[in-house]
Amino acid sequence: MEAVVLAGGKGTRLRKAVAGLPKSLAPIGKHPFLSYLLGWLRAQGVTDVILAVGHRRTDIVRHYTRHKPQGMRLRYSIETTPLGTAGALRNLRSMLDGEEFLVLNGDSIFDVNVRRMLSFHHRHRAETTLALASPPEAARYGSVLLDARSRVKAFVEKHTDVLPREDGKPGASKWISGGLY
């Protein structure tokens, strides 16, 4: 199984805390955050990872050249200008070995059973499957609105009363993206 980790962001909200590092290399204990994400992927059976890197990409490449995760093939897709999620995927499509792959945000871990998610994906013959969460304070995040068949109807940035929730009442949806597709 292949995965693409989107690790090209500037991390402007973390700038003071990470002192010049890209946010995916933010130290958590003794290791960078991205190392925990790669370890989680390996535990899920994912051994082939493409890191889509942009901002401070040389720091990320240098770190993982020196500290290559065991049992994992790492490749890099370099963005010289920010391309966004779709642009990053378009940029690396020739690097993908197959049509089925995971995409993860490089700044969050969402504990999902990947095998169950893939089973759901195949059972529903979906083009894309998103892992969603329903945290207690969902209004603090961008929302995902679903239709009656649990298909994505809209993405809404942060809390807004512009679109109705799934139940038709005004306000933000209880669902947020887990950053795993």
Please place each PLM-identified region on the residue numbering.
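Short, flexible helix/strand-to-coil boundary loops that buttress conserved ligand/catalytic motifs
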Residues: 18, 64, 156
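Glycine-rich "HGGG/HGxG" loop immediately N-terminal to the catalytic nucleophile
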Residues: 11-13, 124
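Conserved N-terminal catalytic core of the sugar/cofactor nucleotidyltransferase
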Residues: 1-5, 13, 27, 31-105, ...
